[in-house]
């Protein structure tokens, strides 16, 4: 909460506030007394696994591989530890993840443009930078069109798909307009979400060039891709730095992203590139976290790649990397949340 004109305001965007209104109503009715962060995190995790399981139907038939890949985004990545902490920023990332995978499901597997738009609104309502992925969803909604199609065919396809695009946009545009009004009412600017109003935040050294800056890119690259683990003299002999480490070290399964194939390869890599650029420009690469928590919003697009570029049946390399990834993230969860081994 930040002070302003004799009041206190949340620095979370409107979508994030609305996401937890049901919990607030339960507190108001005295059904619960404290914010059930870990219960909400568990609900997000369960629903996300369900949608990942359903999304696998796009390009796979193996039940074993379907189960493994549905579990991987939660238990084989930094989502497990960060979401498991139940903090407000982590819950917002969890809602964004759920919104993205739900939007992909209702776009690609069971086309329901209005529901896809509702989930997309949930996603960018919790992480504003996800608005950058909107053109990718538009592309997925508008396809398919044959490679040899003429401009006439393209215009005909656009007219045919336009109603679906409009249904998709109803809730996101509504939320966007309400968010602009919400920001203006609090801080007299539709673009001011309030983060810069946190006392002394702009005095922190990593924000000297602003909340977002190209100067922040090298540090974010270091944290996201190259930061390693620490060590200690007793079992398990290594421990994790509390301010980030490489997503590929924390989840070796991600090395499989670079295999060839997949029907949605271009769309997925485009979304990953757009979102990663926005994340790398953030002055602070995540603060207290395991691995690179911002990259949680990349996982649904990584999932599309992994589903499409792998074998039809479960392979030994996939099982091996899955086991290693789950072990690393399970250990991280234990060290971060159940022990006092992790220190600044």
Locations of regions flagged by a protein language model:
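Membrane-proximal envelope and lipid/glycan-remodeling enzymes
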Residues: 1-344
């Amino acid at each position: 909460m930040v002070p302003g004109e004799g009041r206190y305001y949340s620095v979370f965007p409107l979508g994030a506030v609305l996401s937890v209104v049901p919990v607030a109503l339960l507190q108001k009715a005295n059904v619960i007394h404290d914010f059930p962060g870990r219960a909400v995190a568990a609900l997000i995790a369960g629903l996300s696994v369900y949608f990942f399981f359903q999304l696998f139907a796009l390009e796979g038939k193996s039940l074993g591989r379907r189960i493994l890949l549905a579990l991987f985004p939660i238990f084989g990545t930094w989502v497990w530890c960060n979401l498991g902490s139940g903090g407000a920023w982590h819950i917002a990332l969890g809602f964004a993840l759920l919104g993205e995978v739900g939007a992909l499901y209702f776009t690609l597997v069971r086309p329901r443009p209005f529901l896809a738009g509702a989930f997309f609104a949930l996603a960018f309502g919790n992480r504003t930078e996800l608005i950058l992925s909107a053109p990718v969803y538009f592309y997925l909604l508008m396809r398919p069109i044959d490679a040899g199609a003429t401009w006439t065919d393209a215009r005909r396809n656009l007219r045919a798909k336009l109603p679906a695009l409009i249904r998709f946009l109803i809730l996101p545009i509504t939320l966007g307009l309400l968010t602009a009004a919400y920001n203006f009412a609090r801080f007299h600017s539709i673009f001011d979400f309030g983060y810069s109003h946190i006392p002394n935040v702009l005095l922190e050294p990593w924000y000297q060039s602003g909340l977002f800056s190209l100067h922040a890119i090298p540090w974010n690259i270091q944290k996201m891709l190259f930061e390693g683990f620490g060590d200690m003299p007793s079992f398990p002999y290594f421990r994790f730095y509390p301010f980030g480490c490489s997503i590929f070290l924390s989840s070796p399964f991600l090395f499989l992203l670079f295999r060839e194939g997949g029907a949605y390869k271009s769309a997925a890599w485009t979304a990953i590139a757009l979102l990663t650029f926005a994340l790398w420009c953030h002055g602070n690469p995540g603060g207290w976290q395991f691995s690179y928590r911002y990259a949680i919003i990349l996982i649904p697009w990584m999932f599309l790649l992994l589903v499409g570029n792998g074998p039809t049946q479960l392979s030994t390399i996939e099982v091996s990397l899955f086991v290693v990834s789950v072990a690393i993230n399970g250990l991280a969860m234990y060290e971060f949340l159940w022990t006092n081994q992790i220190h600044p």
